[in-house]
């Protein structure tokens, strides 16, 4: 083992927080046993302590990233990088830079994501590591997408896909194809986006990876929704929400139910929309998610109103009004009162409409 190699005694999988992207499966060694570099005894001891401390900081930074402590993670990882640079450990510099890129991406600092990823790629020219390379390319592609530089994003993700195919790494192919779908969708090239996303779905189904299927199905649904192809969007969202329920991903299911309700409303299928919104309302209350609860009540009121069921619409709008007053949200209260005013008038109850108009109820 050379002085730059680490002992992969324990591996951690990088965690990606962004809900609409699938990161590559990237195993990170935790820097166990290392062979000391040649030199005097004093120099060897100094380097050993540097490496040991740097390794601990890297592990600490990874743990902080996984716990969502992003500022602390950046601090730990930057310190680790300086120490690995001081002893000339190239492989560990690559790994730290890859983590710094991930933490920056998770923090929505896309320029820093690009900076660290490009530094990582520069080191990879002399010390190749395909697993780290696909991660760096993935971060670059996704970061450029967020900066609306779709051409650059596509270039990096195409290179990422090429390497994953060369490695026959199917899980990483799923991520690369999915992320290419996202950048093509952002660029308005919906047909191309669907082509990549469906290829990603085929592989993830073959792998029987429910978590991956949930992500890919949601993204295909979103692309069809952007195309105003609501029946296809509904079909993919329904498959997706079944998996979210299976995995007990309650927050994900809540968001999908919102999308399903919106797509059903777009096709004037208000009865079905109400079923989805009612389920979302139950989940919102289970999660104690006030914002989702008020959105669900508003959506339910709208859907009932569209069906001409004004009494039921008023019930939901009144619940929204009570919630707005409970959390002292003036804007929400004004919206609820306006909805109640309009619905009462539609019902012919002008006296009650006047009371809502004046805010007396």
Predicted regions located by residue number:
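TPR/TPR-like (Sel1-like) alpha-helical repeat modules
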Residues: 317-318, 322, 334, 338-341, ...
